[in-house]
Amino acid sequence: GKEYYEYLVRMSTGTSYASVDELTDAVTRRIDEDAAAMANELTAELYLEMLSYSFSETEPDAILADLKVQTKQEFPELPECSCTIKAVPEALELSLSPAFYLTPPMDRFQDNVIYINGSEEYADTPLYTTLAHEGYPGHLYQTVYFSSVCDDPIRHLLSFPAYTEGWATYVEFQSYFFDNGLSPELQNLLMRNQAVTLGIHALLDLNINYYGWTKDQTAAFLEETYGITDRETSDRMFDAMVDNPANYLEYYVGWLEIQQMREQAEETLGSSFDPMEFHTLLLDLGPAPFTVIRAHFQSWLVTAPLTQGDLAA
C-alpha cells in the first residue's frame, strides 16, 4: 500500500523532501520548467539537428579516452586505473540495459569493466552520454574515486542508489556540454529533452504506485500532456512502473537533488562558484542520504567563498 511505497521512496532515494506529496510537486515543477525551456528554445533548424546529430567520437574506446581527458577540467584527478570494454553476450541482449558498469572488488578498484549491449533495440541510444554515465565521470569514476579516499570498509557495504545513480545521471547530462562536436544550442536542447523524458517516468512511478493511477488514467495523462497517443506504449510504461516501484526515482530524484544543489551554489556564489570544488565536495562525501548531504552542502556553501578567497590570495 501507500505506506510501503513511502518506505521504498525513503530507502531508494534518501530524498531531502519530507513527503511523497512534496517530492511529487518538486518533480512536476522541474519537468514543467525544462519542457517550457525546450519550447522556447526549439527552432525548425534545431529540430532537424536533433533528428540527425552525431557526437565527434563514436567508437567506445575513443569515447572513453575523450571523456577521461575532458573530465579533468571540472573533476578531481583519479588514481591510476584501467577499463576494459566488453560486449554483452547475444543471448542476454534482450534482458539487459544498453550498457552497465561492473563494480570491482573494494581492494582491486584499479581494474574496471563496462559492458555494451549491441542489441538493435538500443541503436538510437547515444553511446557518448551512455559511457559518460557508466564510465567517466560516472559510475567508474565515482567508484574509483570513493575507493581511493574512503578508509572505512563498512561504507562499501552500504547502499544509497539515488546517490550513485543520481551522480551518474547528473554527469551524463553534463556530458552534453562537453567539447563533443555539438552546438551549444543543441547541447542544451538534448540535455533538457533527456531530463524531461526521465522525469516523465519518475512522475508516472509516483502517480501509479502512490496515487493509484489506472492504465486509462496513465494513457490519458500521456496523451493530454505530452501527445503520446499509442496505447501500447502507455501500457508498457504502466507495467514497468508496477514491476519496479521507485526504480526511476533513484535516477531522477538523485539527479534533481544534485542539480538543485549546483544551481543554489551558482546563484549564491556567483562568479566564485567553482565546479571542481562542488564536485569534490560530493565525491568526498560519497554515497549517503541526501538529508545528510544537504547538511554538509549548506555548511560548504557558507565557507566556500572564504576558502576560495584564501586560494586566490
Task: Describe the residue ranges of each PLM region.
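N-terminal maturation segment of proteins
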Residues: 1-313
